[in-house]
């Protein structure tokens, strides 16, 4: 059985600690992937987790989702996240069983599996999630008729129907064109701004962090450097970690 992260009773509002790591060590099999990692994620922050493949971004997500126990140190979640329905997760892609006649409504309502939501509340939840994902009025449409970008929006809606305090996205805009990518980020930015949702977004795309992020985490060489985007995206910090400088806002890296 995987040990759950420690639960804290302190901090729940915008700016208070939702996730705290103290000298955290994470393993993938026998290999130590991340070591001596410390950071604090405050409520209402928009984080971008950046780094090459194999540097520990997905391993960190697994720990945050309770799928991987720390090999050392401490990972503490606020008590409001102890109910896993308070955490929404958006994967890179999802392939429902093609035999099923899946409507957008049926697909999005899968996000309520395991959540304690009264039947009378579900229609309002669905309407809210579709509106925030830019899919209003499409609930009766077939999932299979959606474009790639619309399917990613449906994945976002499926996570949002839980009304999560923490939304985690694992490279959800990979393989999407620039305009679709930007539209999805605009959806997330509005959610962050209007609802105060804390967002963790894993990506290789430095330009997204430059434009949208309040905080970033840089993964490199078994370490994670975390802090405000204005500090970590300075050329000298990026040069030290990756030998690169950030693009200007709006320039795709």
Task: Please place each PLM-identified region on the residue numbering.
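Conserved ABC ATPase signature
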Residues: 142-146, 150
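H-loop/switch region of ABC-family ATPase nucleotide-binding domains
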Residues: 203-204
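Helix-to-loop junction immediately C-terminal to a conserved catalytic motif
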Residues: 65
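H-loop (His-switch) and adjacent beta-strand-loop-beta switch element
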Residues: 216-229
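Catalytic Walker B motif of ABC-type/P-loop ATPase nucleotide-binding domains
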Residues: 167-171
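Conserved ABC ATPase "signature" region
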Residues: 121-138
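Conserved catalytic motifs of ABC-family nucleotide-binding domains
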Residues: 163
């Amino acid at each position: 059985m995987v040990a759950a992260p420690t639960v804290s009773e302190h901090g729940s509002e915008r700016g208070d600690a939702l996730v705290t790591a103290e000298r955290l060590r994470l393993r993938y099999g026998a290999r130590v992937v991340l070591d001596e990692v410390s950071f604090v994620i405050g409520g209402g922050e928009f984080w971008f987790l950046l780094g090459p493949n194999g540097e520990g971004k997905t391993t960190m997500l697994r720990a945050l989702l309770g799928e991987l126990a720390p090999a050392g140190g401490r990972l503490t979640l606020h008590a409001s996240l102890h109910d896993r329905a308070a955490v929404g997760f958006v994967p890179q892609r999802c392939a429902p069983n093609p035999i099923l006649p899946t409507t957008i409504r049926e697909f999005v309502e899968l996000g309520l599996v395991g959540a304690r939501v009264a039947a009378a509340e579900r229609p309002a939840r669905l309407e809210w999630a579709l509106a925030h994902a830019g899919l209003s009025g499409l609930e009766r449409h077939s999932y299979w008729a959606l474009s790639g970008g619309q399917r990613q929006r449906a994945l976002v809606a499926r996570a949002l129907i839980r009304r999560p305090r923490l939304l985690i996205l694992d490279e959800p805009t990979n393989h999407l064109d620039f305009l679709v990518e930007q539209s999805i980020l605009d959806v997330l930015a509005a959610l962050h701004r209007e609802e105060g949702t804390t967002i963790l977004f894993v990506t290789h795309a430095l330009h997204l962090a430059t434009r949208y992020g309040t905080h970033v985490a840089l993964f490199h060489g078994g370490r994670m450097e975390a802090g405000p985007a204005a500090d970590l995206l300075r050329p000298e910090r990026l040069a030290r970690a990756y030998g690169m400088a950030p693009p200007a806002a709006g320039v795709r890296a």
